[in-house]
Amino acid sequence: MNSHNITNESLALALMLVVVAILISHKEKLALEKDILWSVGRAIIQLIIVGYVLKYIFSVDDASLTLLMVLFICFNAAWNAQKRSKYIAKAFISSFIAITVGAGITLAVLILSGSIEFIPMQVIPIAGMIAGNAMVAVGLCYNNLGQRVISEQQQIQEKLSLGATPKQASAILIRDSIRAALIPTVDSAKTVGLVSLPGMMSGLIFAGIDPVKAIKYQIMVTFMLLSTASLSTIIACYLTYRKFYNSRHQLVVTQLKKK
């Protein structure tokens, strides 16, 4: 295995890449200098904290701490997903249920099949990958669902007036929203290895692992990303479409205003 380590000095020199981005922003008057500095500073602090937390959890190797960390990851993913729901109020609970269930089922299958072991060194990184992907998919699902409901209010009202239930009136919108949310994950699976070398595969190869073995892990990652994204978006969409209707099965127009 490759024993090369990144020193603090080399990391400081790599910071020059950020300076390049800042210079481009300044030259082109993009006004992103503060955002770049803030995002980089925040990323450094967050990663340092997470690094020490993970080091402690890995050394303790406690099942309850591992589960707690997985729930914390799902909590943060749900919190960020609901912030992207521009047209849906109070979507955190739905997001948390969707992402936690999707990630939980996927992790359970991976552990029971022997693909990974229930140890923090394997469970936590995998949970981070699938929860992050589910977060993006659920956010896209919310946005698409809200936009479609707003643009098709008249058609929905007509269906309701003809006796359709909210589920029947929203069926096409739900299907299209789930489909739109899954397209990035599906497209990524189509081009994996051809357009880009994904994170896990690149990391393993960089660490000196045999590329063929790294590919097996990446195939597993592709499977789990598709599974979690599908489960999470379906659950999220079916939990949130009801928010556009009241107890009398009427479309709540006031709730459709963009926040």
Swiss-Prot record:
Cytoplasmic topological segments: 27-35, 78-91, 139-191, 240-259
Keywords carried by this UniProt record: Cell inner membrane, Cell membrane, Ion transport, Iron, Iron transport, Membrane, Transmembrane, Transmembrane helix, Transport
UniProt cross-references to PANTHER family, sorted A to Z: PROTEIN ALUMINUM SENSITIVE 3, UPF0014 INNER MEMBRANE PROTEIN YBBM-RELATED
Similarity comment text for this entry: Belongs to the UPF0014 family.
Lineage: Bacteria, Pseudomonadati, Pseudomonadota, Gammaproteobacteria, Enterobacterales
Gene deletion effect: Mutant exhibits increased sensitivity to H(2)O(2) stress.
NCBIfam families, sorted: iron efflux ABC transporter permease subunit FetB
Function noted in UniProt: Part of the ABC transporter complex FetAB, which is probably involved in iron export and enhances resistance to H(2)O(2)-mediated oxidative stress. Probably responsible for the translocation of the substrate across the membrane.
Organism: Escherichia coli (strain K12)
Mode of membrane association: Multi-pass membrane protein
Subunit and interaction comment: The complex is composed of two ATP-binding proteins (FetA) and two transmembrane proteins (FetB).
InterPro entries: FetB, UPF0014_fam
GO cellular component: plasma membrane
Major localization class: membrane
Compartments where found: Cell inner membrane
Source superkingdom: Bacteria
Transmembrane portions of the chain: 6-26, 36-56, 57-77, 92-112, 118-138, 192-212, 219-239
Protein name: Probable iron export permease protein FetB
Pfam family, one: UPF0014
Any GO BP annotation: intracellular iron ion homeostasis
Keyword check for Mitochondrion: no
